[in-house]
Structure formats: C-alpha cells, structure tokens
Amino acid sequence: MLIGFSVVSFGQMSNKKPVEKTVSLGLKGGVNVPRMLYFQNEALSQLPQAFTVTPTGGLFVDIPVGEAVVLAPEVMYVQRGTDMSYEHRSGAQVHYTMLASYVDLRLPLEFRCPVSNYFQPFLVIGAEGGMRLFGQIHMDRTEPIAMDETIDVGDANLALIHAGALAGVGVRSRVNIGASYILLKLSVTAHQGLLDSYAQGEKDGTSAPLNVNAYQITGYRLPQGLEACLSIGIPLKAGQDDACATFSKDRYHRHSNRGHLFGF
C-alpha cells in the first residue's frame, strides 16, 4: 500500500503548484489492534494477550495552521479491550475476552517534513477523549470449575469515559484532479489510555461483575491500541484560485485579440 501511495505522490511532482492552505474534510478508516496495559498488577501484566484486529473509522478535518503544522481533529469509532488465556490456580484453563465500542473525539497535530508539495512525511501527536457505547465480556473455563458466560459491558464493569494520548508517523499527498485535488494520508499511530478503565463499582465491591470472578482487581487497567489508517479528503474551497486565474487569462486573450482585430 505504501509503495503504491508513493508512486501516486511522486507522479504528481511533475505538475508542482504552491501549497494551498485550504481546509479539507474527509473520511478515515483502517484497523486497530487493541490490548490492555495492567499497571501495578504484576500477575496480570505478565499474561500474554492475543493479537486481535478490529475495524476503526470516522470523519476528519484537515486545518493548516502554519507552513509545516496541521491540526486534524477527528471523530472516530474504535474498539478497545483484551483477549487473554491463563491457568487458574485450581488448574482450570481460563479464556477471558473483553471488547467494547467507543466514539472518540481526537485532536492530533501533524508536523510535516516538506520533501515536496506532493509527498510529505509527518509526525503526529495528540490527545483523545472517548465515551463507551456498548460491548461484551466473555469468560469460559474448564473443569474443575467449568463455566461459559457472556455479559454486556456497563457501569458495573467498565468505565464510561476514556482519555488518552496518541503519537505516530505518516505520509500525506495531494493528487491533482483537474482544477482541484484529493488529499491522501496514510498513518500508523500508537494510542495510550491515561484513565483507569476499571469501573469504580467493581473496585470498591459495590458491584459483582464477571471481572471479579475472573481475577482479583488491583492496580490499573489502561487501554492501548495500534492503528493503521488511510484518510481521503477533499478541499472545501476547491479550485477557486485556479478559476480566478483562468478568468483573468481569458480576459487578457479577449482584449489582446480585440486589439489585433481593430488595430489598437
């Protein structure tokens, strides 16, 4: 994908134009690899977590705020959770999964390296805040204490609000189409939650969700993610400058032809 993206980008270099400081609006989509960081809980932090790929997508706005800086706020759908297997002290084999859907508001800042107008690597850092929508927790285990149960996530077993930070790298390009262009961005970002995702009810004992039966809740459970996304945007003022330039040239040619026709 990156090779194809680069070929399209460099193909545009033969028709260079000044970089327009134009706001763009578009769609962003890709995949996310969610997991959990168990902090101050040595037992859980040592358990392996399965590699899980989930879809993610949303809307973004690309707002240039300087020669090499872009503010790119976005609203995204993303899934967070974990998938782990371990052996209980009783000898039972336990499989525990949690996958919850969120809607995020993110405020990334992109710092571009202007290699050319049509191929610009960038670094991105930013903040994100999200709200839990829905999801499920599933646990199954073998004898001698066999069980297989699935419950919905809620206030009793998963915090409602998510807040975190993100950082990553990417490349951006402009693909000219007539008098306008399409903005393309390919990015890979790491996401780190900063708020504990354990619900207060399950930590203070006022609720007894499936989590309590799976393990002793201590420390903090912080969501993490690794996203790879493609963004496609269109300018909100497409081709206005080119239209003015074309109108001016047309007037010049008409006046020039009239002068030759009438001799002045």
Task: Go through the PLM ranges and name each one.
Residues 35-52, 79-102, 130-162, 196-206, ...:
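Extracellular/periplasm-exposed beta-strand and loop segments of Gram-negative cell-envelope proteins
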Residues 10-58, 233-239, 259-264:
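Short glycine/proline- and aromatic-enriched beta-strand/turn motifs that initiate or cap beta-hairpins
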Residues 2-10:
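Hydrophobic h-region of N-terminal signal peptides that target proteins for export
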